[in-house]
Design a protein with these regions (language model features):
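Short basic/hydrophobic patches in alpha-helices and adjacent helix-turn junctions
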Residues: 112, 149, 161-168, 183-187, ...
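Alpha-helix boundary/capping and short turn/kink residues
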Residues: 60, 75, 149-153, 168-171, ...
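N-terminal polyanion-binding entry modules of DNA glycosylases/AP lyases
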Residues: 1-119, 187-191, 195-214
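Short, well-structured alpha-helical segments that form the helix of a local strand-helix-strand
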Residues: 82-85, 89-90, 129, 173-185
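A generic structural signal for well-ordered alpha-helical surface patches
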Residues: 68, 127, 157-160, 179, ...
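Short, charged, surface-exposed loops that flank catalytic or proteolytic processing sites
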Residues: 76-77, 119-122, 169-177
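Catalytic DNA-binding helix-loop module of base-excision-repair DNA glycosylases/AP lyases
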Residues: 51-54, 106, 121-169
Length: 214
């Protein structure tokens, strides 16, 4: 096994399956460790996509509060968000921070959401998502991996820190890091899903970049 695969096994042994991306069931956010069939409805797919926008520049707990506010207000659907005023959306997603910017991003996203097709290939989906104002590579790839269950590796600040801590990679742009992981692993959305979630868990648990599994 290469070092990237060995590290994955160590993370999995240490932290267990993470159950990402969490979805709303009943009136609470629920994780689903080991169940990679989720999302298994259009409603859950949309939840994940909106969650990926809300978690930009904040932690998941803040994004979670904003997502639940939209759900409680019965606005967590493309047609309802399209009709809602920016003022109403901004007030509900305030816990996620940058709420005015995120409101505009959500409005822009729902305008295009109906054009997204799960049957599209990854490159086509990614190109389309990146053409939507307010969606960068991390958000687009999170939607592709977690909402559409397609094998693309998500890169974030935790991933870069993880790479530095384990001497895997110390420089490069977003796609350099993404391709590094994708070439080192079997192309399976379940592995990419779990590995990224485990790296996020590692990032939250570790106190410094010197905390490693080597």
């Amino acid at each position: 096994l290469n070092i990237v695969c060995r590290l994955y096994q160590k993370l999995l042994k240490t932290y267990g399956k993470q159950g990402w991306w969490p979805v709303i069931r009943g009136s609470s956010i629920q994780y689903h460790p080991g169940d990679y069939s989720i999302p298994n409805s259009e409603e859950e797919r949309f939840q994940i996509a909106i969650g990926a926008i809300l978690t930009q520049n904040t932690n998941w707990k803040n994004a979670e509060k904003a997502l639940l506010n939209l759900y409680t207000a019965r606005l967590l659907a493309p047609e309802k968000l399209a009709k809602a005023s920016e003022y109403e959306i901004a007030a509900l997603i305030r816990p996620s921070g940058y709420y005015n910017q995120k409101t505009r991003k959500i409005k822009e996203f729902v305008m295009h959401y109906g054009c997204l097709d799960e049957k599209e290939k990854i490159d086509s989906l990614r190109e389309f998502l990146l053409s939507i104002r307010g969606l960068g590579p991390e958000t687009a790839d999170s939607i592709i991996l977690y909402a559409f269950k397609k094998p693309i590796f998500v890169i974030d600040a935790y991933t870069r820190r993880f790479c530095a801590a384990h001497n895997l990679k110390t420089s490069g742009d977003y796609d350099d890091y993404r391709e590094f992981f994708e070439k080192s692993l079997r192309k399976d959305h379940r592995i990419f899903n779990e590995y990224h979630a485990l790296i996020v868990r590692w990032g939250k648990e570790s106190k410094s970049t010197n905390h490693n599994f080597s």
